[in-house]
Design a protein with these regions (language model features):
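N-terminal nucleophile
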Residues: 1-78, 83-274
């Protein structure tokens, strides 16, 4: 996963909404999102090379579970240019996990363990998001750089093994809208800033799901003077600056919209691009 915007407790009845693009090399085999045969309550894509995932949810009643037809629309409570927090007393029945890599080619270890297993292991577990972070924290430096976003139905936690300077690292996030790419949470990369603002606008408008997929299909590249410097060649930096990445060997392979409901199983809709 290389770009994810998400809203936590700003939409009544829907504690978590996320929209994301997964960017990957085209020759890396993967499986589209669906229930996992060995663990049917997990609904996620799968990396067929290392066995982990980049994003997924749990549906506690398995692949045949149903949800009400009249669940809340995706409309946030917007006020004074921001969002009114929405408190939900009950724990949502589904879990959510997503990961992005931190782009640092000079700090990449090809022998490091698979970061995708951090997602699949959380989805298969029952511990809280904070407890899971504390479990993996001692060995986190062994992985290449990553950001994890974890929801246990009660709290949403962001954790990065490169995020020590940020006080939010490993702690429950406050209600709000967030953006994450291949740097730390809310880093002001052009595509993060732009997509986060558009996502917030769609939430205030109560836009249909199709609008979120249109947002994720934006191929606009950032001007050179606004590109981050991450250690890759300039032309690659230009390619990677788009929300939807297009290049001969690497690009956006799936777009996904996830809704974690307060009183119904989570819904994950994925568009496979390549």
């Amino acid at each position: 996963m290389c770009l994810i915007v998400f809203a936590w407790r700003v939409v009544p009845g829907v504690p978590l909404i996320a929209a994301a693009n997964r960017d990957e090399y085209f020759d890396r085999a993967s499986q589209a999102a669906g229930p996992w045969e060995e663990n049917p309550h997990v609904v996620a894509g799968r990396d067929l090379k290392a066995g982990g995932s980049w994003m997924g949810v749990t549906r506690p009643d398995g692949p045949e579970c149903q949800w009400p037809a009249n669940v809340s629309p995706l409309r946030a409570r917007c006020q004074d240019g921001g969002f009114a927090p929405v408190e939900t007393a009950d724990k949502a029945p589904s879990r959510f996990a997503a990961i992005t890599n931190i782009r640092a080619p000079d700090d990449f270890d090809p022998q490091a363990p698979s970061r995708g297993m951090l997602v699949s292991n959380f989805l298969s577990a029952t511990m809280s998001a904070r407890d899971y972070v504390e479990q993996i924290r001692p060995g986190a430096k062994a992985y290449n750089g990553f950001n994890l976003v974890l929801c246990d139905g009660e709290e949403l936690v962001w954790f990065s093994n490169r995020g020590e300077p940020d006080a939010r690292n490993g702690q429950p996030l406050a209600p709000g809208v967030y953006g994450l790419s291949n740097a730390l949470l809310d880093s002001p990369w052009p595509k993060v800033v732009r997509t986060k603002a558009q996502f917030a606008s769609l939430l205030c408008l109560g836009a249909p799901e199709e609008a979120y997929f249109e947002m994720l299909a934006d191929t606009t590249r950032a001007p050179d003077q606004r590109l981050p410097e991450t250690g890759v060649p300039l032309e690659r930096e230009r390619q990677l600056s788009a929300v939807k990445i297009e290049s001969p060997d690497y690009g956006t392979r799936t777009s996904t919209v996830v809704k974690v409901y307060a009183e119904a199983p989570a819904v994950l809709h994925e568009q496979v691009i390549r």
